[in-house]
Amino acid sequence: MTRLLSTGRPPAVRAPSRAAGAAAFTLIELLIVVAIMATLIGLLLPAVTAAREAARRAACSNNVLQLGLALHNYEFHREAFPAGVTDAAGPIKSLPEGRHVSWIVRLLPYLEEQALARHFKEADGAYAAANAPVVATVISSLICPSSSAGSVEQWPVRNAAGPAPDDSLDDLPSEIPQPRRVAVSHYAGSHHDVEAPIAADNHGMLFLNSAVRFKDIEDGSSRTLLLAERVAPPRPPHELDGRDDLGWASGTRATLRNTSVIKSSAYGAAAWGDQQPVDPLFVGGFGSFHMSGICVSAMADGGVRQFTPDIDPDLLRQLGHRADGEIPKDDGGW
């Protein structure tokens, strides 16, 4: 019988196969992969954000183009641009009183909103209870896709005990008529070249009881601002004053602005400073919801232009005057 001789050494241990451990990651390798992925995401996110904002700005430009086209169609049929606001007398206060029928109301048939036009009772005014369902209707072409604000404004209700709940109608002041809920417009017509109340002697294209014709635009339609974006400064809650947005049917600062300034919502509430309007006669300038601060606008010839907040103030003022006889600069932020 053959006997196996002991060598005195422990039996050999087979080393693990290289193929068996090839699929596993070490901790260092995993951390490297995570770091690479984080870097790629950090590089791609700004590009994605910029692409989305560019798409929103293009949609906003299309809204402005459609409004400009509607104004031109109105002028073609009526031989004059619509009144910026229709009322018995001015100056116009940004408070829910009077008729205050806006230029947007006149444009409803040209914005494919014939149903709203038929149901709006112009003789009753923008704040009449009979017009509540109409003025609470959101019109998509009046909303900027980049807006951080809502498309509907809720008017506050106050009583002697302080702010009332939104659904309360107790002690509704008689000077604050219905409706309390209104749809807004992020676009406004140009009523004047400097800060001034909305009145019949304004220098812009759309103002109190106006009926501007092309022959009245002595500076040239391509050099006269027709409409542009606007942003609203913040207002304290439960305070009804000149800061309230009275909706697209109201021919107040809700739908009319001047070329005194271009504001960007990207600067935040602090950018408004002392220009927060407390006086109901205050109108304010145009503004933008876009990240870049670009304000999309339409000229009187229908062309769509883009302004920046750092536009030359003199150039901006000149564009807001239809017949000042001055030659606007060819640069300066437009």
Q: What is the predicted role of each segment?
A:
Residues 39, 43, 54-334:
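Surface-exposed loop/linker segments characteristic of extracytoplasmic
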Residues 8-9, 31-35, 71, 260:
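Generic low-complexity, intrinsically disordered sequence content enriched
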Residues 16, 35, 264-265:
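Compositionally biased, intrinsically disordered low-complexity segments
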Residues 1-25, 88-90:
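N-terminal leader/signal peptides at the extreme start of proteins
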Residues 21-56, 66:
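N-terminal single-pass transmembrane signal-anchor helix
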